[in-house]
A protein has these predicted regions:
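Two-component/phosphorelay signaling modules centered on CheY-like receiver
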Residues: 19-37
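Hydrophobic beta-strand core positions in alpha/beta domains
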Residues: 59, 87-88
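Conserved acidic carboxylate
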Residues: 16, 90
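Acidic, metal-coordinating helix/loop segments flanking the phosphotransfer/catalytic sites
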Residues: 38-57
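Non-catalytic signal-transmission and effector/linker regions of two-component phosphorelay proteins
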Residues: 1-13, 19-20, 26, 43-44, ...
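Conserved phosphotransfer microenvironments
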Residues: 61-75
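Conserved phosphotransfer active-site motifs of two-component signaling proteins
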Residues: 91-95
């Protein structure tokens, strides 16, 4: 009988334009056993997703001030890379006001690290079970 090999720590793409918040989230992600991959803009995030086919979880700040809004990038990620799991956060939006992409989870800021880490672990387990290969 074949057994699947453990995949090791998964990378989590963090899309956050505020340096202090990005560092805080990266630390949280790393402490939870994931590998933080940081993007400061939507353009940088798309470039990373086009080259890093190992990314299965994306953490997005919806309060991005320039260009494409966080909810729009979340929808674009869902359309282009359906297997990717999405965590959305915001200080200025309420969940009821958002049209969330399928399977996306929303957390109001300030986030509770334990809740977000639990969501990441659940998402990682779900992608592991589904065997989520995705094209670049």
């Amino acid at each position: 009988m074949g057994q699947s090999q453990p995949i090791g720590p998964l990378p989590v793409l963090i899309i956050e334009d505020q340096p202090v918040l990005r560092i805080e989230v990266a630390d949280m992600v790393e402490r939870a056993g994931f590998i933080p991959v940081e993007a400061t803009s939507v353009d940088e995030a798309i470039s990373i997703l086009e080259t890093r086919t190992d990314i299965r979880i994306v953490y997005i700040d919806l309060d991005m001030p320039r260009g494409v809004k966080g909810i729009e990038i979340a929808a674009a990620i869902r359309d282009r890379w359906p297997p990717i799991e999405i965590i959305l956060t915001a200080a200025t939006f309420a969940k009821a006001d958002l049209d969330l992409p399928v399977r996306a989870e929303f957390y109001s800021k300030p986030i509770h690290h334990g809740d977000v880490i639990a969501a990441m672990r659940r998402m990682a387990a779900d992608t592991d079970r589904r065997g989520c290969d995705r094209p670049a």
